[in-house]
């Protein structure tokens, strides 16, 4: 006879390992999709492309080109999330919220990668890859953040993956209070920051890049 009877009450249960890892790999795929876009498509408008359009301002070029990347990014994220839901058949308590989190993540990620690339060129692409590696290691995607080194614990709240995965996990396992919307709100802060960089700070950044390129050419190294 058992003197103690254990009663288990599961809270936000996840059915299988694949469903628990879906938020991480979906987030990772959306970011990689953004990197692929800037690698395949031009982020700037050529002189031939502006024929007949006079006095185009930097913010008009920035937003016009970003719209193309935004549409393609949303298509990518839709395919990824629908693939999770209907092809892989992951557990998901709130399918629409899962899709919404994927869309918001794509809007933010594509903007970050696009802004870095249009502002810094190839250096911006490299920074996007570095950010990818940092976020894979430092956002608790595969292991709890509590077991990560101190550096990653410090930057954990400052990385976009953190809030995307949290929102996607809420959609998969079930909502708790307003956490889902709070995570999406935090994610949108990155969008505001990089929009300011692309629309306001880009002009002085371009001047610095041009000066740097001229100095680099003078060295004859590259």
Enumerate the language-model features and the residues they cover.
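Membrane-spanning alpha-helical segments of multipass transporters and channels
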Residues: 1, 5-222
């Amino acid at each position: 006879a058992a003197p103690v009877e254990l009663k288990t009450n599961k809270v936000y249960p996840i059915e299988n390992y694949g469903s628990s890892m879906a938020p991480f790999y979906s987030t990772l795929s959306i970011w990689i999709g953004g990197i692929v876009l800037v690698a395949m498509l031009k982020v700037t408008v050529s002189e031939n492309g502006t024929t007949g359009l006079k006095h185009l301002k930097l913010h008009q070029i920035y937003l016009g080109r970003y719209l193309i990347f935004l549409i393609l990014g949303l298509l990518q994220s839709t395919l990824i999330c629908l693939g999770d839901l209907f092809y892989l058949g992951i557990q998901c308590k709130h399918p629409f919220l899962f899709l919404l989190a994927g869309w918001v993540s794509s809007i933010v990620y594509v903007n970050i990668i696009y802004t870095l690339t249009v502002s810094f060129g190839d250096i911006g692409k490299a920074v996007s890859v570095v950010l990818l590696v940092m976020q894979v290691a430092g956002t608790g995607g595969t292991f709890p953040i509590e077991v990560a080194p101190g550096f990653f614990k410090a930057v954990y709240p400052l990385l976009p993956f953190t809030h995307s995965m949290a929102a996607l996990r809420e959609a998969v396992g079930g909502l708790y209070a307003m956490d889902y919307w709070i995570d999406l709100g935090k994610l949108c802060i990155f969008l505001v920051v990089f929009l300011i960089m692309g629309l306001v700070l880009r002009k002085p950044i371009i001047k610095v890049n041009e000066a740097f390129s001229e100095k680099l050419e003078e060295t004859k190294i590259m």
